[in-house]
């Protein structure tokens, strides 16, 4: 039942809006990750708008579709003044292969290696943003792969086990349905960088009390949890108000 986690949609080509991010500001890249090829985009601020030290946000998207589906979220992060990297997991969009817990770790490692290979990236200024499923590679990267500057999570689950229990009507252990643990509670405990958690108060798919609160309670400092009243699973930026959402993310990446 890993399809419960990986609701991917393959694409032959990406069609991305350019009203906020001009085509001249985005670079497509491909990476080898295990036996798969990973596709993504690096979105770069104009030199005239760069502020040093210059942050980079790695956006780890949710379990549906492909990066094109999340492009409006990339645009919001671009408006914070940071560079943004977004990529597709295996089997999503143009990326090849099949996703699993182990492959997500491999893909996140390949993405970080790519960032560290770029001469225009300050590797002390890398932030991870994980939405829903993307909370796992975001927290894993910060806990195990490098010294991240900070992590932002939005609408993430506590663990695969907890997700199965709250997201289905099947009352059996999650290990019968998922091949991985996806233990975000343990990763939040292990990471040492600042953590900003955003979660909708009206999220019925990943309920706040079961998931966000339990992660926050277990996580070490520094940490901040914001319950966004009225927001459903995908509705945090809208319920916040786009301008306030952008300013809150900007304050986090400028204040650490």
Tell where the protein language model's regions lie, with residue ranges.
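An N-terminal hydrophobic leader/cap segment in hydrolases
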Residues: 1-32
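Membrane-embedded segments
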Residues: 32-114
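Short alpha-helix in the alpha/beta-hydrolase fold that links the catalytic acid
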Residues: 73, 184, 193, 207-217
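Alpha/beta-hydrolase fold nucleophile elbow
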Residues: 121-132
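Hydrolase active-site cap/lid region
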Residues: 135-193, 238-240
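Acidic catalytic loop of the alpha/beta-hydrolase fold
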Residues: 202-207, 234-235
């Amino acid at each position: 039942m890993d399809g419960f986690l990986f609701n991917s949609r393959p694409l032959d080509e990406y069609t991305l809006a350019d009203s906020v991010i001009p085509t001249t500001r985005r670079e497509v890249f491909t990476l080898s990750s295990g036996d798969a090829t990973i596709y993504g985009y690096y979105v770069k601020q104009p030199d005239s708008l760069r502020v040093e030290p210059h942050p980079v946000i790695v956006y780890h998207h949710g379990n549906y579709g492909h990066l094109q589906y999340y492009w409006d979220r990339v645009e919001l992060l671009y408006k914070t003044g940071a560079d943004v990297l977004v990529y597709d997991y295996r089997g999503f969009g143009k990326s090849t292969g099949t996703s699993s817990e182990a492959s997500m770790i491999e893909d996140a490692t390949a993405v970080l290696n790519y960032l560290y290979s770029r001469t225009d990236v300050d590797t002390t200024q890398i932030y991870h943003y994980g939405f829903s499923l993307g909370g796992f590679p975001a927290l894993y990267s910060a806990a195990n792969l490098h010294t991240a500057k900070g992590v932002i999570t939005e609408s993430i689950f506590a663990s695969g086990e907890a997700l199965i229990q709250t997201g289905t009507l099947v009352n059996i252990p999650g290990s019968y349905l998922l091949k991985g643990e996806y233990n975000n509670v343990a990763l939040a405990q292990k990471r040492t960088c600042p953590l900003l958690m955003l979660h909708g108060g009206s999220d019925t798919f990943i309920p706040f009390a079961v998931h966000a609160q339990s992660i926050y309670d277990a996580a070490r400092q520094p940490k901040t949890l914001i319950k966004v009243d009225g927001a459903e699973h995908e509705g945090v930026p809208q319920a916040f108000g786009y301008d306030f959402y952008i300013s809150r993310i900007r304050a986090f990446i400028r204040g650490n």
